[in-house]
Amino acid sequence: MRSIFENGPIEINGKNDRKLLVRKDGFSLNTGNKEINVSFDDIRYTNVTRYCNSNSSYMVMMVAKDGKNIEFDTDVTPVGGGHNILETKTILTAFAASRLGKDFPNNLNTLDIELTHSLKEKQISISNGVIKGAKNSIRIDDIHTVKCVSNGALTRFAIYAGTKKRLFNAPDFAVVCNELTAPLLEAIVTRNTGKGIDFSRGDGFE
């Protein structure tokens, strides 16, 4: 995965001495009141909330390998006439690049990383060409269709193997949309079929 962070860190400065420095292997955030230093090697997966308002701050939770949660707010200053997602997007892009690796998307069948977590599947990961959770799994070579489905608050990817008709159009596997699953599934379904993710149901506000 080509990464702009290979050329050096990206610095974002805000009001009240706020400073974010994002590197290819982690980041530091000084809010003016406290400082956070994170190495991506210590992180299992991320969760971002408060994204329903396009000009409000975000709450980023990073679940660390030691079981502790690292929580902080990003993009706390509204941006007139634009979507204030610069801090959030920069951190998530760097994290995704560190996880997917330099060879992405040519390493799909050799990736061995944790992707996310859900109540049903618990830990969801990809290893040896298989996306798997506690109850279900799917070979990436069998993936034929990926649909983005949103209700306005929660966005997930419905994953289908083959073209067979199914009851209530139930997917073979489902994962939350995040900075890892989006580029990963886009690369998989494009490689398999020449077509990317179906985003026609991705806007839950309409």
Task: Please place each PLM-identified region on the residue numbering.
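Acidic, Ser/Thr- and proline-rich intrinsically disordered linker/docking segments
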Residues: R44-L115, D142-E206
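A broad, low-specificity signal for short, low-complexity segments enriched in glycine/proline
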Residues: F5-G8, L86-E87, S118-E121
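Compositionally biased, low-complexity repeat tracts
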Residues: I4, G26-S28, V63
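Phosphoinositide-binding peripheral membrane targeting modules
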Residues: I12-N53, T116-G162
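Short Lys/Arg-enriched alpha/beta "domain-start" segment
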Residues: M1-I12, N16-V22, E206
